[in-house]
């Protein structure tokens, strides 16, 4: 959990503590997946609710290695397996890398929450349909 906690403290992260990660992993309505090749390379955390999966966090140690795509695909498969029709998420308007990643994954912008984050930036709301 220590490696995951460190990843959760990167810029734009929700700053999950070790205990929060452990608690979330124990929930029956959560999907918590870790990319691990002897060392943690990334993780994805989502919650399932009424046919939807809400992405809570997706983090990778290094960009451009395919770990994020692998985790996203695994999340989609796990969410489908739990009967979800879509993955919903929010991303900071300032986090262009994440926005690009989600758009490449075919997530669509469906709304905006003004001044959602502590720094006053808006949250961009996106949906990813699960066929």
Model-derived segments and spans:
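Acetyl-CoA-dependent GNAT
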Residues: 2-63, 69-74, 78-82, 129-131
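Conserved hydrophobic/aromatic "anchor" residues
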Residues: 12, 21, 43, 101, ...
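Conserved catalytic core of the tyrosine transesterase superfamily
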Residues: 30, 86, 92, 124-129
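Residue-level recognition of the GNAT/N-acetyltransferase active site
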Residues: 61-63, 90-94
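Short glycine/proline-centered loop/turn elements that form peptide/ligand docking sites
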Residues: 72, 94-98, 115-120
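Conserved GNAT acetyl-CoA-binding A-motif
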Residues: 79-90, 113
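Conserved catalytic-core motifs of GNAT/GCN5-like acyltransferases
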Residues: 90, 103, 108-125
